[in-house]
Amino acid sequence: YPIMPIYLKTIGFSILLIGILEGVAEATAGLSKGYSGKLSDITGKRVPFVQLGYAFSAISKPMMAIFIYPLWIFFARTIDRFGKGIRTGARDALLSDEATAETKGKVFGFHRSLDTLGAVIGPTLALIYLYYFPKDYKTLFYIAFIPGVLAVLSSFLLKDKRVNDIQPKVKMPFFSFLKYWKESPSAYKKLVIGLLAFTLFNSSDVFLLLKAKQSGLDDTLVIGVYIFYNLIYAIFAFPIGIISDKVGLKTIFIIGLIFFSIVYFGMSVNTNLYLFFVLFFLYGLYA
């Protein structure tokens, strides 16, 4: 992930074009999450969505390096986010099935901790590779296909829980998942409205990395600060998840938003190398 904005800049993408790319990609992920999540509920299946989602994301990695045409890059990045959208709802449902009201934070915190540990190991290996082969970003995308395939293969160890009720076959238009809004409880609606407002002011982590690079950090330090952020994320996700079960999910969520605000304000005015690490430390706690 930290390689991508640097790679896009080297092949001629402007910051505006990178922003449009990320917007299209995240919109694809968001819409596919809603549709795939509902389809997973209707079919009673979780694992096939997880497998298909990881497969799409794996395929997208070498696609980023095959051609450098903007439309092709848009297509490859969208495939990656489409895969994320397909698997996310089903994966979270699998986690929810294993959690109780008292262990929600613990279960999801443990998942995020291990998931983010991979985001530490991957960029670290990429950093080592770039030390010996500077600027060879394309090869890294080809190499990234290997762990992607391993993720798909490991997903075959998962098993769906037996569903007693036979699910009827129904036609499901793509935007039909939006109908849930009408029947959802008021507490859910308030949460979604709050998240929507937050998302409108949020931006991709790509821009934080580009800001760091724009402020004078070289490619190695940009990747290094991203590794540091993910390391903090991985270390604290599980214990903070446990704490959230004790003090309340809402309290931890609000504290996270405060950290987010501090980080983005700091990023807008900071040019100091060491302060970037402080800000990414707080960003890791927020995440």
Where are these regions (language model features)?
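Cytoplasmic helix-loop-helix junction between adjacent transmembrane helices
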Residues: A76-L117
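Helix-loop boundary and gating motifs at the non-cytosolic
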Residues: Y1-A29, A187-V225
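Structural signature of the two symmetry-related core transmembrane helices
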Residues: P48-P62, F145, T251-G266
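Juxtamembrane intracellular "pre-TM" segments in multi-pass secondary transporters
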Residues: D160-G194
